[in-house]
């Protein structure tokens, strides 16, 4: 059995491409001939596939009756013209050609199913050829009519196509707006003031300006009310919500703190306001004591800080000293890392680099050379942790030489921060004695109680410390980049050139003697310089 061959592609007619050019009789005749050839070829193909379909039908009938007997007597073809008698055995075994010389053995029943599948393919091919035949038969008829028209009218034929204008659009037609188009007349409001009567909704210019000023005053009032933090004082402590602290830290608006008649509460208020503002700047703080409001600007705060510097050397015996005036607050230093335009990095050899400013060092050398070789070396002001490393240097021939470690001294005699000199040792003893006297005064103030605090202040005025001794700063240092309540402040020591803030000391419940404190290198260096 041979599989049916694929139908050949139908030849494309020559055309209708000639319709654009003027039609002539020879061209129309040739077009008709080509179309007739396609029709004839389709008819031949249809006849061929119909014959194949008949052969498959006969084969299918034979395969159905073949397994009825074990053997059949048949004439076996021996060449194109010779036959010889033979016997057909194994009637239920059929070899089927699958294609490309591939064969498969199957039973007679399976072979019948294969024949039926191939017959379906043959029928589909015949239907396709019949459609092509019908299409080209209609074209042949059209070409015959066209040839008759060309023969009657000559070489030119007028072809007209009727176009209906009533097309139906599914979507709405969109119209682009002009960039500077005028508004529609329906949207324009025309006021009629012919009778001299004004509508109720219109205002005069004066009324409009008055209304605007009233709205501005309301905005200012609302802004001031929103900027006031709601402060609650309970058991002498300040409780401010975290949201108001964030608002006070982010925006530099006026902060109004309502306070009771207690003077201690006013000092607590100011402390909370100062701690919430960055860089230690208080922007327009408002203190209300006994119903009277007093506004302090940044300049007033600076003057108050200068007054605090003068009172730094006095002993803080009790807490009421800080509650009397609103100038005292918890000592806090707000700092930012030092950024200088020009720096020189000096490698000390142990993964440490010291940074110096060329301009500052040059100015210091000039001052030292002008004052003399035995002039006192001036310590740099400590404003950030980076400035601490500038203190720990040795002076050799009037120049700074960095140390390998800030915990060791290369030259004890020429060191700026040497703590082994005789003067520093003497100052240490003086300082220890001063601390003992201060602790005894604190013990007396504690026993006296809260009722006798005012009497102690009147009878025992504060004794100023010696001029050569300056009290060290032992408050809190907060970096401005990390203004968060969760961060724990750490203690630091400020230089004597900086304004020191008196520390607020809490009165202990029981009398206890203060043990002797050790003197740090910073204090020893400062005492040595003062001597």
UniProtKB/Swiss-Prot annotation:
Residues 300-319 have a biased composition (Acidic residues). One of its GO terms (cellular component) is cytoplasm. One of its GO terms (biological process) is response to virus. The keyword Transcription applies. The modification Phosphoserine is found at residues 369, 439. The keyword Cell membrane does not apply. This is Unconventional prefoldin RPB5 interactor.
């Amino acid at each position: 059995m041979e599989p049916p061959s694929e139908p050949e592609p139908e030849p494309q007619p020559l055309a209708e491409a000639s319709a654009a050019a003027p039609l002539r009789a020879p061209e129309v005749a040739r077009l008709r001939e080509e179309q007739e050839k396609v029709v004839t070829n389709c008819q031949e193909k249809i006849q061929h596939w119909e014959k194949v379909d008949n052969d498959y039908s006969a084969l299918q009938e034979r395969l159905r009756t073949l397994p009825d007997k074990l053997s059949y007597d048949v004439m076996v073809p021996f060449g194109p013209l010779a036959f010889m008698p033979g016997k057909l055995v194994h009637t239920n075994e059929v070899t089927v050609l699958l294609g490309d010389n591939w064969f498969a053995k199957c039973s007679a029943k399976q072979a019948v199913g294969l024949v039926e599948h191939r017959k379906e393919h043959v029928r589909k091919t015949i239907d396709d050829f019949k459609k092509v035949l019908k299409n080209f038969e209609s074209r042949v008829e059209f070409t015959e009519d066209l040839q008759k028209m060309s023969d009657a009218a000559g070489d030119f034929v007028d072809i007209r196509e009727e176009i209906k204008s009533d097309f139906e659009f599914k979507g709405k037609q969109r119209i682009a707006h002009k960039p500077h188009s005028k508004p529609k007349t329906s949207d324009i409001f025309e006021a009629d003031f012919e009778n001299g009567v004004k509508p109720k909704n219109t205002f005069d210019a004066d009324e409009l300006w008055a209304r605007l000023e009233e709205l501005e005053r309301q905005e200012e009032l609302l802004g001031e009310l929103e900027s006031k933090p709601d402060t609650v004082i309970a058991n002498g402590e300040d409780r401010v919500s975290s949201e108001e602290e964030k608002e006070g830290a982010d925006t530099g608006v006026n902060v109004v703190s309502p306070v009771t008649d207690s003077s201690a509460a006013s000092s607590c208020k100011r402390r909370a306001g100062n701690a919430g503002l960055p860089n230690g700047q208080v922007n327009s703080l408002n203190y209300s004591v006994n119903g009277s409001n007093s506004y302090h600007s940044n300049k007033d705060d600076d003057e108050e800080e200068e007054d605090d510097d003068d009172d730094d050397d006095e002993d803080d015996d009790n807490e009421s000293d800080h509650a009397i005036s609103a100038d005292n607050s918890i000592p806090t230093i707000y700092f930012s890392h030092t950024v200088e335009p020009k720096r020189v990095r000096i490698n000390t050899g142990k993964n440490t680099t010291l940074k110096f400013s060329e301009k500052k060092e040059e100015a210091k050398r000039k001052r030292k050379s002008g004052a003399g070789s035995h002039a006192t070396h001036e310590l740099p002001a400590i404003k950030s942790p980076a400035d601490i490393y500038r203190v720990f240097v040795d002076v050799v021939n009037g120049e700074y030489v960095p140390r390998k470690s800030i915990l060791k001294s290369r030259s004890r005699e020429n060191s700026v921060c040497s703590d082994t000199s005789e003067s520093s040792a003497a100052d240490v003893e003086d300082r220890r004695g001063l601390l003992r006297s201060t602790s005894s005064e604190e013990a007396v103030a504690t026993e006296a109680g809260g009722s006798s605090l005012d009497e102690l202040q009147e009878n025992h005025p504060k004794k100023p410390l010696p001029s050569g001794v300056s009290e060290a700063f032992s408050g809190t240092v907060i970096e401005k980049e990390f203004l968060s309540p969760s961060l724990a402040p750490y203690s630091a020591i400020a230089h004597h050139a900086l304004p020191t803030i008196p520390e607020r000391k809490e009165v202990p419940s029981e009398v206890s003697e203060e043990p002797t404190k050790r003197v740090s290198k910073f204090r020893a260096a400062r005492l040595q310089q003062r001597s």
